[in-house]
Amino acid sequence: MDDAPKLTARQQQILDLVQTSIERTGSPPTRAEIAAELGFRSANAAEEHLQALARKGVIELVGGTSRGIRLKSDTLRSLNQLRNKQFSLPLPSLSQLMLPLVGRVAAGSPILAQEHIDQSYAIEASMFPRRPDYLLKVRGMSMRDAGILDGDLLAVQKAREAKNGQIVVARLGDEVTVKRFRRVRGTIELLPENPDFEPIVVTPESGEFEIEGLAVGLIRNTLLM
C-alpha cells in the first residue's frame, strides 16, 4: 500500500520485536532489551532506530519511562495491507471491537458485571496483538516505568493463568490491581514498575486471589475524548 511507511530491514526487525514483546508480556521492551536481543553494543543504538521509527510515524515515544514505546494504530492499518510482506508476525485484522470500559469493581462480584461497566467503545482490532475482552481504567502510577500511566485504558484479555513477566489484572481480596506477575516457589509476587511502590506478595494467608486477565495493549485516555 502506497501510504505504508518504508522501513529498513533493521527497523522492521525492531518493530517485530516491539510487537512480540507486547504480545507476550503486555508491555514493550526497554532500549537495553532491544540492544541485547539484536546484538547492539549499547542501548543508544536502539534509541537511534526508535527515533527513526518515530519520525516515520510508525511508533510514538513516551518520555519519562524506559518502556515508553507505542505502536500507532494508523500505521498498523497500513501495514496490515502488506499481508506480512514486511513483517514476520501476522498483523491483526481490521475489524472493530465493542469493548466495555470497567470502572470500579465491587468486592465479590465478576469484573464484567453490568454494574461495573461505565460505557463501551468501538476500537479497531488492529491496535492490539491479541483480542481484548474489555478496557480497564488505570488508577495510580505504580506501573509508570512500563509506560502505563494514571488514567490510561488498559486493554485486557480474560485469563485465569499467567506466565512470569506478564502484566496481569489481579483481584486480591477487595482490590483489583495491575501488576507484573512472578511466581517464586510457593508464592506469587505482583511487581510494580515504579520504585516508589512495594511488591505485593501473595501467600495462602493473603486471602482471596484471582487473576482476571492479561494486558494486551494500552490506550491513552485522551484518544477516546
Curated annotation (Swiss-Prot):
Represses a number of genes involved in the response to DNA damage (SOS response), including recA and lexA. In the presence of single-stranded DNA, RecA interacts with LexA causing an autocatalytic cleavage which disrupts the DNA-binding part of LexA, leading to derepression of the SOS regulon and eventually DNA repair. Keywords: Autocatalytic cleavage, DNA damage, DNA repair, DNA replication, DNA-binding, Hydrolase, Repressor, SOS response, Transcription, Transcription regulation. One of its GO terms (biological process) is proteolysis. It catalyses: Hydrolysis of Ala-|-Gly bond in repressor LexA. Gene3D superfamilies: Umud Fragment, subunit A, Winged helix-like DNA-binding domain superfamily/Winged helix DNA-binding domain. It is an enzyme of class 3 (hydrolase). The keyword Coiled coil does not apply. The record marks 107-108 as: Cleavage. Its EC number is 3.4.21.88. Residues 31-51 bind DNA. GO terms for molecular function: DNA binding; serine-type endopeptidase activity. This is LexA repressor. The keyword NAD does not apply. Disulfide bonds: none annotated. Belongs to the peptidase S24 family. Homodimer. The active site is at residues 142, 179. It holds the Pfam family Peptidase_S24. It comes from Methylibium petroleiphilum (strain ATCC BAA-1232 / LMG 22953 / PM1).
